[in-house]
Amino acid sequence: MKIIGIDPGYGILGYGVLEKSGNKISHITHGVITTDKELSMYKRLQVIYEEFLRLLKEYSPDACAIESLFFYKNVKTAIRVGEARGVILLATSQMDLPLYEFTPYQVKNNITGYGHSDKKQVQKMVKMLLNLDKIPRPDDAADALAVAWCLAVETRF
């Protein structure tokens, strides 16, 4: 089973693809979708949508895991990230993929055993759990791998 994990954003959206076979979870790829600040928000959403569809077609995941919005101090940022999430949800639905959401607390708790871990702890554990040579960069890609890991270890899979 292939899982694509998403750390939503509109400037930088992280993704990570894992494969689960029995009890083994393997890293396939990770990266980010970036959008140019000079583009209108509509065009930025279009870039996210088209690039995400390309990833879905290239890696053919069986499921998608996405981090849910939890809390943002900046309302404008929360709205923009919510719009980017909406584009991901639409593309996932169009490809008829099951979608699973995890809160930041669930992701941290699942990866480190402590729901209030900081980013560096999560990144180090992602590196260790996936047997990677180095911590995935940028941070958004490491976060997306952590989200995918959460789904991979769920009992329903």
UniProtKB/Swiss-Prot annotation:
Any GO molecular function: magnesium ion binding
Domain of life of the source: Bacteria
Location of the active site: 7, 67, 140
Location in or out of the cell: Cytoplasm
Principal location listed in the UniProt entry: cytoplasm
Entry's Gene Ontology cellular component terms: cytoplasm; Holliday junction resolvase complex
Record-listed Mg(2+) 2 binding positions: 67
A GO BP annotation: DNA recombination
Co-factor binding details: Binds 2 Mg(2+) ion per subunit.
The enzyme's E.C. designation: 3.1.21.10
The protein's assembly and partners: Homodimer which binds Holliday junction (HJ) DNA. The HJ becomes 2-fold symmetrical on binding to RuvC with unstacked arms; it has a different conformation from HJ DNA in complex with RuvA. In the full resolvosome a probable DNA-RuvA(4)-RuvB(12)-RuvC(2) complex forms which resolves the HJ.
HAMAP family named in the record: RuvC
Family statement: Belongs to the RuvC family.
Protein's job: The RuvA-RuvB-RuvC complex processes Holliday junction (HJ) DNA during genetic recombination and DNA repair. Endonuclease that resolves HJ intermediates. Cleaves cruciform DNA by making single-stranded nicks across the HJ at symmetrical positions within the homologous arms, yielding a 5'-phosphate and a 3'-hydroxyl group; requires a central core of homology in the junction. The consensus cleavage sequence is 5'-(A/T)TT(C/G)-3'. Cleavage occurs on the 3'-side of the TT dinucleotide at the point of strand exchange.
Protein name: Crossover junction endodeoxyribonuclease RuvC
Species: Thermosipho melanesiensis (strain DSM 12029 / CIP 104789 / BI429)
Encoding gene per record: ruvC
